[in-house]
A protein has these predicted regions:
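Ferredoxin-type iron-sulfur electron-transfer modules and their immediate structural context
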Residues: 1-144, 236-263
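Glycine-rich FAD pyrophosphate-binding loop
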Residues: 166-182
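Feature captures the FAD/FMN-dependent oxidoreductase FAD-binding
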Residues: 76, 139-140, 144-148, 200-248
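N-terminal glycine-rich dinucleotide-binding loop that anchors FAD/FMN and/or NAD(P) in oxidoreductases
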Residues: 114, 184-212, 251-262
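Residue-level detector of alpha-helix initiation sites
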Residues: 86, 151-152, 176
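N-terminal Rossmann-like FAD-binding beta1-loop-alpha1 element of flavoenzymes
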Residues: 143-169
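Short amphipathic alpha-helical segments
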Residues: 159-160, 182-183, 246-250
């Protein structure tokens, strides 16, 4: 068992120098090095009650994956993450950990919580850069499910179902999969090719089929999917893609953009 690191504060995240990043749109946060990740992981107390797990929307076994990092078993950590999430590199970057897992971390009572999101990101990035093995496809269970929308919820459902042996097809209205991950989060926060595209590729490797430029209700209907194409269930994850307006004068003037358009 690795020796605990009782530092009160997180290991700082390396970032682009301001004089460099003000001239590009590359990712600002650069991620932990191997040694930084191991050192930060050793701050985890592996609490008996695991409040961080209860606060995680997908119930990742956080202490277990962090313990693997602390013991320098990065692929073991990735295997634990993969049991609960198909998008660890995305979630490690953009999930609001401060309100979820890290918000409940015992280390945060006196000092800073463990950098759970940073460690999740490190594990996912390390696996992507060092492991070339495709995910193991489970045995098909003979059931067929349609997923409407290739945003984070659709990708998550598709990945989870594929791991259980379901034959899954995602129908996406736009020409690229990813939803808000592609169209709503800036490149400097979430790189599209380096991260999002690679996460989607992993979902495809599980056997999930993607059909883009398909508008449900126009190109086809839910009834047709179930009655004519043999889908036994449909998950609707169409997202909240339309911007909200305040209804004030000048909103439609030239040069006025919604938040969606701006991002």
């Amino acid at each position: 068992m690795a020796e605990r690191n009782m530092d009160m504060n997180k290991c700082p995240m390396p970032v682009q120098d301001p004089d460099v990043r003000n001239k590009n749109f590359d990712e600002v946060a650069l991620g932990y090095t191997y040694d930084m990740a191991v050192n930060e992981a050793r701050r985890c107390l592996n609490c008996k009650n695991k409040p961080c797990v209860s606060a995680c929307p997908v119930q990742i076994n956080i202490p277990a994956f962090i313990e693997r990092v602390a013991n320098e078993d990065i692929e073991g950590a990735f295997a634990i993450l993969s049991e609960s999430t198909s998008l660890p590199a995305v979630c490690g970057r953009v999930c609001p950990q401060e309100n979820q897992c890290e918000g409940k971390c015992v280390r945060g009572i006196k000092g800073e919580p463990v950098g759970i999101g940073r460690l999740e990101r490190f594990v996912a990035d390390y696996h992507r850069e060092h492991c070339t093995d495709a995910p193991v496809k489970p045995e098909p269970n003979g059931h067929k499910v349609a997923v409407i929308g290739a945003g984070p919820s659709g990708l998550t459902v598709a990945g989870d179902l594929a791991k259980l042996g379901y034959k899954v097809t995602i129908f996406e209205a736009l020409h690229l999969a990813g939803g808000v991950l592609v169209y709503g989060i800036p490149e400097f926060r979430l790189p599209k090719q380096k991260v999002v595209a690679k996460e989607i590729e992993k979902v495809k490797e599980l056997g999930v089929k993607f059909e883009t430029n398909v508008v449900i209700g126009k190109s086809t209907t839910i009834d047709q999917l179930m009655e004519e194409e043999g889908f036994e269930a449909v998950f609707i994850g169409s997202g909240a893609g339309l911007p909200m307006f305040m209804g004030i004068p000048g909103e439609q003037a030239n040069g006025v953009f919604s938040a969606n358009e701006y991002l």
